[in-house]
Amino acid sequence: MTMPFGYASPEQQVRDKSEYARKGIARGRSVVVITYADGILFVAENPSATLHKISEIYDRIAFAAVGKYNEFENLRTAGIRLMDSRGYMYDRRDVTSRALANAYAQTLGAIFTESVKPYEVEIVVAEVGPTTDDDQIYKLTFDGSIADERGFVAIGGASDQVTTSLKEHHRDGQPLADALRVAVQALTVSVPPGLPQNGERVLTAANLEVGMLDRTRARRQFKRIAGPALAELLAQTATSS
């Protein structure tokens, strides 16, 4: 049977979409999500003060993303609305990161399957629990695949390099300053597109976005760390390294 001009098999279409999405994500600077003694720390290389990669979703739940900003921002706002409505209709304790991750997986999977263009995003959804063992971290990719991560996860174009560094230096139950040092050190190893591949980079408070889910806080447990507070914490990491 003669195939029509421009025909591509389903397998080829999936490969093309995957390659397209990966190329878009590879242009994004990495994000690290890492556990520490009192919660979960989010660290992103992000020179923008207004376009956030890290965000609170609901009480104990936060979100991090890389890729195309308008696409992951749509997912972020949809996630907030979904969790707010769930908490209003049922109980705040029924709002979980697992439910949010499943909703994102269904949305991303449907877009990847049904649309010509997939979303160019990688996402992390995390929830802080009463103890470290109860913390939950989920990584979602452009095709709706979902993975349950323990301890740490990296997303973005240089995630393999970043993950290698995290595996070497992360320790369970580490204090906040140590977790930040490990995360920043891992991000420093990665080299964003357009920058030279040699020479050690220095990441400062001006080009980092940092947030945390702190289990010691009441109710709303997400907190941003910025400005002088971040600079002071980075100084502590320098003296303890």
From Swiss-Prot:
Xref: CDD domains: proteasome_protease_HslV (cd01906)
GO molecular function: threonine-type endopeptidase activity
Pathway participation: Protein degradation; proteasomal Pup-dependent pathway
Chief place of localization: cytoplasm
Compartmental location: Cytoplasm
Highest taxon, organism lineage: Bacteria
Activity modulation notes: The formation of the proteasomal ATPase ARC-20S proteasome complex, likely via the docking of the C-termini of ARC into the intersubunit pockets in the alpha-rings, may trigger opening of the gate for substrate entry. Interconversion between the open-gate and close-gate conformations leads to a dynamic regulation of the 20S proteasome proteolysis activity.
One GO CC term on file: cytoplasm
GO biological process: modification-dependent protein catabolic process; proteasomal protein catabolic process
Keywords for this protein: Cytoplasm, Proteasome
Subunit structure: The 20S proteasome core is composed of 14 alpha and 14 beta subunits that assemble into four stacked heptameric rings, resulting in a barrel-shaped structure. The two inner rings, each composed of seven catalytic beta subunits, are sandwiched by two outer rings, each composed of seven alpha subunits. The catalytic chamber with the active sites is on the inside of the barrel. Has a gated structure, the ends of the cylinder being occluded by the N-termini of the alpha-subunits. Is capped by the proteasome-associated ATPase, ARC.
Function: Component of the proteasome core, a large protease complex with broad specificity involved in protein degradation.
Entry's family note: Belongs to the peptidase T1A family.
HAMAP family xrefs: Proteasome_A_B
Protein name according to UniProt: Proteasome subunit alpha
